[in-house]
Curated annotation (Swiss-Prot):
UniProtKB keywords: Endoplasmic reticulum, Membrane, Metal-binding, Transferase, Transmembrane, Transmembrane helix, Ubl conjugation pathway, Zinc, Zinc-finger
Gene: RNFT1
Enzymatic class: transferase
Induction: Up-regulated by endoplasmic reticulum (ER) stress triggered by thapsigargin or tunicamycin.
Residue spans of biased composition, Basic and acidic residues class: 16-34
Transmembrane segments: 158-178, 203-223, 233-253, 256-276, 298-318, 323-343
GO molecular-function terms, A-Z: ubiquitin binding; ubiquitin protein ligase activity; zinc ion binding
Protein name, UniProt field: E3 ubiquitin-protein ligase RNFT1
Length: 435
């Protein structure tokens, strides 16, 4: 119970001679004030009423109060009064605080224990996962090591089989390498001659034409017994039985021969003088020929593959024959879908070929003088200057070459054309159409 200490001034002592001689009225007045102050302090200590009976002596409180009298006291002391009383509400508050603190400490301890348990479980799960991943990685590494050892032991046998396969198909492999080399050489030469424009060599173009024609004739003459040229007009070569490698052989040779044929047509266009056919018109012809070549090459392999798929069921029962028919029909459906997918592009190419859209209007001399009569692309004087919609001026030939691969202005990147004339530079697609 809390201990209250009241520090009160002591009454004047009557021990001195001088104090006895003070007036009685003055002494009695100071004592009355002293008594009134004590009563006021006691009334404050015991308020509110009705709570003094429930005091608890186990929790002392101390209050130190000092009251100073109104009268002049030359010698005054402090009186300490201990009051062992506390209201019931204070005791209840203290007990409730103790209970709450105990509950809080208990809950806090439970939460901490749960968190520690959860952290320990997570740590164990992490360790287990790491161990499993380590085991999986080690097992994968061991399997890869076993596979490598098996390949290392089997390498001599693989080399023997590879040499045997090469010897069996040495003719086809050698011919394929020769055709690919011929195509790459001719394609690069044609692109260079188209780029040179008026400086192109007519002799070089004539040589390319003769070289491509001679290669095609020599190839068909060498294998005339197989009648490989039949596949150029959607007929089957004269072969008794078509295997997979024979189909691959026929389709591959036919695809290269078609490329050589259209490349020869491009060489003929190169030989045409520029006053008969301008360079701008030649570019559109190159583009049209390449698109025709690609679409024709798409349909040429159809008869050969269709015969191969149908022949799958000729020497078997009804189930195998039905399966062959189903595979052939699926092949035809896929080819038709491919054709209709490219039909939009082909229509766009035809529209460009017949309209030959212009990229701008002819620039005036004043407009050319404003830019010092120098083309920003070729760094030379303007030749047939063209004013674009972005107000930049370039040579017509420079613009034609630029828009063969780009859609925007070389300086400000404003979109000028809605399409790219991919094949106007005379190039031929290197894609091998084998299906």
């Amino acid at each position: 119970m809390p201990l209250f200490l009241l520090s009160l001034p002591t009454p004047p002592s009557a021990s001195g001679h001088e104090r006895r001689q003070r007036p009685e009225a003055k002494t009695s007045g100071s004592e009355k004030k002293y008594l009134r102050a004590m009563q006021a302090n006691r009334s404050q200590l015991h308020s509110p009423p009705g709570t003094g009976s429930s005091e608890d002596a186990s929790t002392p409180q101390c209050v130190h109060t000092r009251l100073t009298g109104e009268g002049s006291c030359p010698h005054s002391g402090d009186v300490h009064i201990q009051i062992n009383s506390i209201p019931k509400e204070c005791a209840e508050n203290a007990s409730s605080r103790n209970i709450r603190s105990g509950v809080h400490s208990c809950a806090h301890g439970c939460v901490h224990s749960r968190l520690r348990g959860h952290s320990h479980s997570e740590a164990r799960l992490t360790d287990d996962t790491a161990a499993e991943s380590g085991d999986h990685g080690s097992s994968s590494f061991s399997e890869f090591r076993y596979l490598f050892k098996w390949l290392q032991k089997s390498l001599p046998y693989i080399l023997i089989l590879s040499v045997k396969l090469v010897m069996q198909h040495i003719t086809g492999i050698s011919l394929g390498i020769g055709l690919l080399t011929t195509f790459m050489y001719a394609n690069k030469s044609i692109v260079n001659q188209v780029f040179l424009r008026e400086r192109s060599s007519k002799i070089q173009c004539a040589w390319l034409l003769v070289f491509l024609a001679g290669s095609s004739v020599l190839l068909y003459y060498t294998f005339h017994s197989q009648s490989l040229y039949y596949s150029l007009i959607f007929l089957n070569p004269t072969l008794d039985h078509l295997s997979f490698w024979e189909v691959f052989w026929i389709v591959g040779i036919t695809d290269f021969i078609l490329k050589f044929f259209f490349m020869g047509l491009k060489c003929l266009i190169l030989l045409v003088p520029s006053f008969i056919m301008p360079f701008k018109s030649k570019g559109y012809w190159y583009m049209l020929l390449e698109e025709l070549c690609q679409y024709y090459r798409t349909f040429v392999p159809i008869p050969v593959w269709f015969r191969y798929l149908i022949s799958y069921g000729e020497f078997g029962n009804v189930t195998r024959w039905s399966l062959g028919i189903l595979l052939a029909l699926l092949y035809l459906i896929l080819k038709l879908l491919e054709f209709f997918g490219h039909l939009r592009t082909f229509r766009q190419v035809l529209r460009i070929f017949f309209t030959q859209p212009s990229y701008g209007v002819a620039a005036s001399k004043r407009q050319c003088s404003d830019v010092d009569d120098i083309c920003s692309i070729c760094q030379a004087e303007f030749q047939k200057p063209i004013l674009l919609i972005c107000q930049h001026i370039f040579c017509e030939e420079c613009m034609t070459l630029w828009f063969n691969r780009e859609k925007t202005c070389p300086l400000c990147r404003t979109v000028i054309s809605d399409h790219i004339n991919k094949w106007k530079d005379g190039a031929t697609s290197s894609h091998l159409q084998i299906y």
